[in-house]
């Protein structure tokens, strides 16, 4: 029997359009200390061009009259960041998908299910981004820094241990 919380969770199968990874263009990213309550396209490049200045403690910028302080954060070596989007178009069930990557014909695939299968693709890539904090630099305790340590931690945990 499922609890009320579990019943409300939507389950999806996510398919990556790997060809979009090759076509993704480099992007400049800013991770802001706020939430934008809009889900849709916005002409950000037209209205958000930060005048970043080097302050005594790092990068500084004003956003809607508030002082933000930040620093450049590099993606861990050997990794690349991608900006991903969910495709909005409905895939015809039972018909071949013209956008599907070639080279996967020898793999057996499950049939697609309407409202269950989702497709994502990359629109941009990045190797660094600017991490902003409100009034102070986020510092080493920022959650994003913890997330960026996971790949190296996972590699260390799963590495072969030499027998003595």
Swiss-Prot record:
Cystine connections: none
Top-level division of the source organism's lineage: Eukaryota
Keyword Ribosomal protein: no
GO biological process: mismatch repair; RNA catabolic process
Chain positions found as Phosphoserine: 3
N-acetylmethionine modified-residue sites: 1
InterPro entries cross-referenced by the UniProt entry: RNase_H2_subunit_C, RNase_H2_suC
Signal peptide span: none
Gene3D superfamilies membership: 2.40.128.680
The entry's keywords: Acetylation, Aicardi-Goutieres syndrome, Disease variant, Nucleus, Phosphoprotein
Region Disordered, annotated ranges: 91-112
Reported tissue expression: Widely expressed.
Localization of this protein: Nucleus
Pfam families reported in the protein's UniProt record: RNase_H2_suC
Cellular component, GO, one term: nucleus
Note: The T6 pseudogene located upstream of SRY on chromosome Y is derived from the transcript of this gene.
Subunit-level organization: The RNase H2 complex is a heterotrimer composed of the catalytic subunit RNASEH2A and the non-catalytic subunits RNASEH2B and RNASEH2C.
Functional note: Non catalytic subunit of RNase H2, an endonuclease that specifically degrades the RNA of RNA:DNA hybrids. Participates in DNA replication, possibly by mediating the removal of lagging-strand Okazaki fragment RNA primers during DNA replication. Mediates the excision of single ribonucleotides from DNA:RNA duplexes.
Family of this protein: Belongs to the RNase H2 subunit C family.
Disorder named in the UniProt entry: Aicardi-Goutieres syndrome 3: A form of Aicardi-Goutieres syndrome, a genetically heterogeneous disease characterized by cerebral atrophy, leukoencephalopathy, intracranial calcifications, chronic cerebrospinal fluid (CSF) lymphocytosis, increased CSF alpha-interferon, and negative serologic investigations for common prenatal infection. Clinical features as thrombocytopenia, hepatosplenomegaly and elevated hepatic transaminases along with intermittent fever may erroneously suggest an infective process.
The protein's name: Ribonuclease H2 subunit C
Native organism: Homo sapiens (Human)
């Amino acid at each position: 029997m499922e609890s009320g919380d579990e019943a409300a969770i939507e389950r999806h199968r996510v398919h990556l359009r790997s060809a979009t990874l090759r076509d993704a263009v480099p992007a400049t990213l800013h991770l802001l200390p706020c939430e934008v309550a809009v889900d849709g396209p916005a002409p950000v490049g037209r209205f958000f061009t930060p005048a970043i200045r080097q302050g005594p403690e790092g990068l500084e910028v004003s956003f809607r009259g508030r002082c933000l302080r930040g620093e450049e954060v590099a993606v861990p070596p050997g990794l690349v960041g991608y900006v991903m989007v969910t495709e909005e178009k409905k895939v015809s069930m039972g018909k071949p998908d013209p956008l599907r990557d070639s080279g996967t014909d020898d793999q057996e695939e499950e049939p697609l299910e309407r409202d269950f299968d989702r497709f994502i693709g990359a629109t941009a890539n990045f190797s660094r981004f600017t991490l902003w904090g409100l009034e102070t630099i986020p510092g080493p305790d920022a959650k994003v820094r913890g997330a960026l340590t996971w790949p190296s931690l996972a590699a260390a945990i799963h590495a072969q241990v030499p027998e003595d």
